């Protein structure tokens, strides 16, 4: 049994978003209270839900007197941070290394033991990301008995880990900022970008989506969700001002709102990317501002059921080929069979975590920040029924530094592929740059700099490389740099010499970059910041019609099977991601369509 000096102690550890602090009160031999006092973790991943660890872990530590708490799948880093910070506080209270080791090995809360089970409901939704939540809400509002099956211990899917951006077309937020935009302008932009490298775009589905972009935003902002829990603890979380709960009739309510509108890229007009609360420029962690209110509304206000930690295995059909339900496996191995009277909606996400599926693209050694469960299982399950899975010739890939963020902002110095060749106007939308690198057959990019460009990330990366504090190569010559990069010195030297010539002339004859972004690279030290491929959104997916029904190659539909979100092929991508906000916006819209179609409601 551990021995402590009675009192209250502080501890800290690094979480997903930064340092996390706890306050622990102990008696001589017990942990009496644990409170997370400060953190920078993300809403919808670490906190804000009925299942997130910042709400659950402190009381479990106290109740079971253990640091051996089961991980909330999807929030692994936050779970570890709470336990490590608590251990640090206990050490300050006098616990020995042996005491801490014993607490980490102490009996964990017993996992629920589920029997094999067979149930019948109206609608089964597989996946609780943006598309699945929107579908479930629409079906529930129509009076259907709905169950969501979710692999993780939290909702949100890839949306919760995203920057939380949404696409709009002439919205009230754009007008407030004096921005002129129309649905036709957005439609033309999407079709132009998507068809630059081939005829990939589905005109009818894109028209349908764009015509309802603003309605989707209005629907999302209209939802008021009940927040449960002790009000003092709830309000102690790091809420963004726009989503901070307010009391209505004795109940705390939260909702989604748009903070502001930002450009797709500084080179592109008009501005049409709508930011979640949390501010513009973010590339991850703010998407929980979208998924959390949807989850709370579905669970707390509509009484909807989510079966967590449960993976869909197989889609069931009758003799005529109509879908009748799914089989699933719970954590622990219990089998769950769910029959669906009205239909099954697949919202299982993409396949960015399936290395075999991504292997056909030139993105070897890629990384991804999407949930580990995004392995394309919805695609393969539907394919077994004869569904058409369109294997698109591209995925969303952005080449970015893992240490300084260069590649995802507006840096516009010299970028080369892994052979040392310049292949693009660097002052372009990041996905245009990435698409050019990928299409050149390169599985990485390099940002060549002498640290003089006016970009914080570049200067940070340059200084770290010069000081030997990073793995990015540094050399006194371009030839020496090329050797460290692993490319042909003559090729990189020729590229560098040509670039310097264009800088001197003030005209980019090769790729048309504006003169003010032709930054000189003169040494005395040269650094190459490695840009790694990051895969997030995957293109293609199950062919669906305008009602979100899953189709076969012959154009017929599979009765009672629907798809929304990344698993669905919405016909809206070419070889590059057109703009932030496209994926979440289409997931919400076609999720709503699926939820309405499966319950025989009029479409939007």
Label each residue range with its predicted role.
Residues 331-400, 584, 593:
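Glycine-rich loop(s) and the adjacent beta-strand/alpha-helix scaffold that form part
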Residues 379-383, 388-489:
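An anion/pyrophosphate-binding glycine-rich loop and adjacent beta-alpha core
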Residues 3-106:
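Active-site- and interface-proximal helix/loop "cap" or "latch" segments in soluble metabolic
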Residues 208-334, 503-523:
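Conserved redox-cofactor binding core of oxidoreductases
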Residues 118-148, 599:
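N-terminal Rossmann-like FAD-binding beta1-loop-alpha1 element of flavoenzymes
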Residues 141-162:
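Glycine-rich FAD pyrophosphate-binding loop
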Residues 63-67, 168-209:
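Glycine-rich active-site loop/strand segments that organize a redox cofactor
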Residues 39, 314, 491-575:
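A glycine-rich dinucleotide-binding beta-alpha-beta segment and adjacent secondary-structure elements
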């Amino acid at each position: 049994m551990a021995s402590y000096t009675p009192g209250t102690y502080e501890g800290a550890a690094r979480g997903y978003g930064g340092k996390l602090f706890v306050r622990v009160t102990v008696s001589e031999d017990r942990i009496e209270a644990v409170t997370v006092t400060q953190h920078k973790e993300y809403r919808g991943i670490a906190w804000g839900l009925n299942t997130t660890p910042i709400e659950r872990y402190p009381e479990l530590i106290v109740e079971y007197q253990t640091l051996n708490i089961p991980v909330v799948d999807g929030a692994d880093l936050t779970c570890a941070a709470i336990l490590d910070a608590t251990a640090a506080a206990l050490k300050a209270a006098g616990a020995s290394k042996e005491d801490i080791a014993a607490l980490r090995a102490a009996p964990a809360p017993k996992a629920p033991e589920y029997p094999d089970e067979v149930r019948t409901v109206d609608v089964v939704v597989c996946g609780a990301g943006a598309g699945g939540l929107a579908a479930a809400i629409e079906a529930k509002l129509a009076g259907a008995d709905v169950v969501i099956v979710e692999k993780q211990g939290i909702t949100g899917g890839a949306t919760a880990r995203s920057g939380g951006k949404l696409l709009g077309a002439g919205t009230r937020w754009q007008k407030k900022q004096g921005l002129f935009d129309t649905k036709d302008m957005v439609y033309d932009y999407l079709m132009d970008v998507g068809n630059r490298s081939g005829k990939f775009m589905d005109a009818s589905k894109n028209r349908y989506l764009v015509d309802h972009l603003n309605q989707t935003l209005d629907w999302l902002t209209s939802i008021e969700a009940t927040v449960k829990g002790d009000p003092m603890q709830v309000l102690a979380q790091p809420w963004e001002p726009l989503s901070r709960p307010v009391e209505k009739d004795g109940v705390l309510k939260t909702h989604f709102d748009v903070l502001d509108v930002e450009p797709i890229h500084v080179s592109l007009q008009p501005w049409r990317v709508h930011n979640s609360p949390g501010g513009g420029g973010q590339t991850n962690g703010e998407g929980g501002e979208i998924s959390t209110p949807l989850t709370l509304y579905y669970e707390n206000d509509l009484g909807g059921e989510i079966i967590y930690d449960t993976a869909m295995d197989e889609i069931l059909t009758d003799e005529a080929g109509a879908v009748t339900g799914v089989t699933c496996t719970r954590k622990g191995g219990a089998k769950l069979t769910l029959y669906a009277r009205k239909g099954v909606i697949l919202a299982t996400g993409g396949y960015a975590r399936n290395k075999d599926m991504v292997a056909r693209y030139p993105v070897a050694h890629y990384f991804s920040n999407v949930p580990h469960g995004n392995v394309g299982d919805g695609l393969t399950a539907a394919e077994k029924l004869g569904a058409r899975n369109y294997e698109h010739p591209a995925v969303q890939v952005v080449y970015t530094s893992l240490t300084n963020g260069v590649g995802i902002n507006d840096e516009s110095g010299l970028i080369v592929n892994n052979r040392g060749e310049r292949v693009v106007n660097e002052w372009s939308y990041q996905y245009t740059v990435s698409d050019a690198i990928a299409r050149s057959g390169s599985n990485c990019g390099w940002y060549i700099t002498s640290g003089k460009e006016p970009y914080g990330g570049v200067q940070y990366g340059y200084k770290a490389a010069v000081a030997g504090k990073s793995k990015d190569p540094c050399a006194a010559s371009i030839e020496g740099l090329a050797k460290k990069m692993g490319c042909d010195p003559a090729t990189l030297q020729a590229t560098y010499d040509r670039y310097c010539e264009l800088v001197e002339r003030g005209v980019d004859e090769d790729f048309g970059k504006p003169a003010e972004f032709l930054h000189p690279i003169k040494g005395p030290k040269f650094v190459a910041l490695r840009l790694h491929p990051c895969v997030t959104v995957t293109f293609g997916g199950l062919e669906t019609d305008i009602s979100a029904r899953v189709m076969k190659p012959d154009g017929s539909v599979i009765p009672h099977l629907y798809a929304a979100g990344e698993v669905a092929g919405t016909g809206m991508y070419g070889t590059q991601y057109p703009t932030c906000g496209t994926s979440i916006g289409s997931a919400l819209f076609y999720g709503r369509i699926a939820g309405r179609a499966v319950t025989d409601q009029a479409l939007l």
